[in-house]
């Protein structure tokens, strides 16, 4: 039975918001929040047919709610939920994914039902701890874990990281054979049809959604498809759009075909680690973040749940590998063979990076390093060793190590792109001249710097500047809205030594200010003693310029050291490089 409910906010001047409930399986109710007029989803893509936010209620001997809804539905959703179930009897909240359109009402739900146990991946629970700002019961799950609600409803969990967030899990009810997928297999399509009766009408939006959200993680899509392949699925309960019932094999086949095409020419790095061991989760995510800045795809592989075939395939196909030291074989009988599988699969054209996991029983890092070197692999960065608990400086080291690895893999691609520009256009663009500057930033114990030339004044009121910062620059992580920095202006006749210093290729974690005279600005960032002038700035916004961030910042204060001196000028002849 399908029930439609109008939201009180659906007056003519307001977006149309309605609710729909339907029994979709034994003891199972779908709650669909229909957002008819939403025309944009985050910054990722335009919406042509609105969207829906779907959640699901399962009543066994225990009761579980799978996901919640967008905050714009707060009053009507929570009231409907209380009409469907006594919230004091709600036992579990399954969080497949924590983006606000699915988790926006979790704080409100926990106020009404503080006894609820929140079930999700480790990353999801960590995120919710920051979102909720109050203690709550939680249960961390991953592939192989299950939860028995009684009356035949045994929930099985499947890890699906990077679809399209690192926290994603899928939930399968073996009793009803319903697969709950949140964003995966969804589409932004709003209408009253509960199921996918007309695939030809839905296909364009289904593919558009895949291209915008899932295509960049195609290899992760294929891994998720492999994990759900053994399941008998009669209904795919998605988080957006209609539920998939009539054409399941078609939709899953499309994901498979599109992803297979995507990965054929994709350069990617496989990062092997052991989830929950030491601080490997934190380090591998930070290294992966650094790699992603260079445009190289990543594949995170938890060795505690991966199978031999998966490890072998990824180790063979990856352009680069990162390995976090697992516990020694004396404490684990399953991980040592997987290390052997990696060693047997790699080849000399690959690059490698290693890090200690800090679990107390790590495999020794240097013997493994020697094995990879003997097999002919090129080392992308020095082994990352943990002498103390990780700090912000450790995060900086890992992020820069990942960026170095990614830059190594994209170097040839960048060189090819530089030669593809029309020669006359290349020379014409090269006639654009700018000043020379050193951008410095510090946040806590982490500080960085870069030579900058793509700098212009962007506004009078407020006083603002725009700086183009390549996405793979180390300092990029210190230039988000709200961050502060100093723009040091180089002097025409006194810039060579500073320019040469900051053009050096620094190893990951190196002090870029060693040997340079500095003093702190009011905002804490370093001012270079030998520069002509400086401006203290705060980042206001960033515009995505494909390979650069265009960072708009307001000027807080500044000073000139030599009134009669001129700014150093950067003259180019070609536009395809700095």
From Swiss-Prot:
EC number(s) stated in the UniProt entry for this protein: 1.-.-.-
Return any one Pfam family short name: ODP
Molecular-function GO terms, alphabetical = FMN binding; metal ion binding; oxidoreductase activity, acting on the CH-NH group of donors, NAD or NADP as acceptor
Residue ranges of the region described as Zinc metallo-hydrolase? 48-240
Alphabetized Gene3D superfamilies for the sequence = 3.40.50.360, Electron Transport, Fmn-binding Protein, Chain A, Ribonuclease Z/Hydroxyacylglutathione hydrolase-like
Miscellaneous field: By homology with NorV in E.coli, may be involved in nitric oxide detoxification.
Q: Would you tell me the protein name for this molecule? A: Putative diflavin flavoprotein A 2
Query: What is the name of the gene encoding this protein?
Result: dfa2
């Amino acid at each position: 039975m399908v029930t439609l409910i109008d939201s009180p906010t659906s007056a003519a001047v307001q977006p149309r918001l309605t609710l729909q409930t339907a029994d979709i399986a034994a003891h199972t109710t779908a709650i669909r929040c229909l957002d008819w007029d939403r025309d944009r989803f985050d910054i990722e893509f335009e919406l042509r047919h609105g969207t829906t936010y779907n959640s699901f209620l399962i009543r066994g001997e225990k009761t579980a709610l799978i996901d919640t809804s967008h905050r714009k539905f707060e009053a009507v959703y929570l009231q409907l939920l209380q009409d469907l179930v006594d919230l004091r009897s709600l036992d579990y909240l399954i969080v497949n994914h924590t983006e606000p359109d699915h988790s926006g009402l979790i704080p409100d739900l926990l106020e009404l039902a503080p006894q609820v146990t929140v079930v999700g991946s480790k990353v999801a629970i960590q995120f919710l701890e920051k979102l909720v700002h109050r203690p709550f019961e939680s249960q961390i799950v991953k592939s192989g874990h299950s939860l028995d609600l009684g009356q035949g409803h045994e929930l099985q969990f499947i890890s699906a990281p990077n679809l399209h967030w690192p926290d994603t899990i899928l939930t399968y009810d073996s009793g009803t054979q319903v697969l709950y997928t949140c964003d995966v297999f969804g589409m932004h399509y709003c209408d009253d049809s509960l199921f996918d009766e007309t695939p030809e009408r839905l296909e364009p939006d289904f593919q558009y959604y895949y291209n915008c959200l899932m295509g960049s993680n195609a290899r992760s899509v294929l891994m998720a498809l492999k994990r759900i392949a053994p399941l008998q699925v009669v209904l795919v309960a998605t988080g957006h759009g209609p539920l998939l019932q009539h054409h399941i094999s078609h939709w899953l086949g499309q994901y498979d075909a599109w992803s297979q095409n995507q990965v054929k020419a994709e350069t990617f790095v496989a990062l092997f680690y052991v989830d929950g061991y030491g601080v490997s989760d934190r380090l591998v995510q930070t290294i992966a973040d650094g790699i992603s800045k260079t445009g190289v795809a990543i594949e995170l592989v938890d060795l505690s749940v991966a199978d031999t075939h998966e490890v072998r395939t990824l180790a063979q196909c990856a352009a680069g590998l990162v390995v976090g030291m697992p516990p020694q074989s004396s404490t684990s009988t399953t991980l040592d063979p997987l290390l052997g599988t990696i060693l047997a699969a790699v080849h000399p054209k690959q690059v490698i990076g290693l890090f200690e996991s800090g679990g107390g029983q790590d495999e020794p890092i240097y013997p493994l390093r020697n094995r990879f070197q003997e097999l002919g692999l090129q080392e992308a960065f020095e082994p990352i060793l943990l002498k103390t608990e990780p700090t912000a400086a450790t995060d900086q080291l890992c992020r820069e190590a990942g960026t170095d690895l990614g830059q190594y893999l994209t170097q040839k691609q960048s060189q090819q792109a530089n030669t593809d520009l029309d020669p006359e256009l290349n020379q014409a663009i090269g006639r654009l001249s700018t000043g020379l500057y050193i951008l410095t930033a510090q946040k806590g114990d982490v500080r960085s710097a870069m030579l900058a030339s793509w700098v212009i004044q962007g506004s009078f009121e407020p006083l603002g500047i725009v700086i183009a910062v390549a996405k793979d620059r180390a300092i990029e992580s210190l230039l988000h809205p709200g961050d502060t920095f100093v723009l040091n202006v180089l002097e025409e006749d006194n810039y060579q030594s500073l320019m040469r210093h900051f053009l050096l290729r620094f190893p990951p974690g190196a002090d870029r200010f060693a040997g340079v005279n500095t003093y702190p600005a009011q905002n804490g960032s370093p001012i270079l003693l030998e520069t002509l002038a400086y401006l203290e700035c705060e980042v206001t916004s960033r515009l995505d310029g494909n390979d650069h961030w265009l960072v708009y910042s307001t000027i807080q204060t500044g000073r000139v050291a030599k009134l009669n001196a001129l700014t150093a000028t950067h003259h180019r002849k070609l536009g395809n490089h700095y």
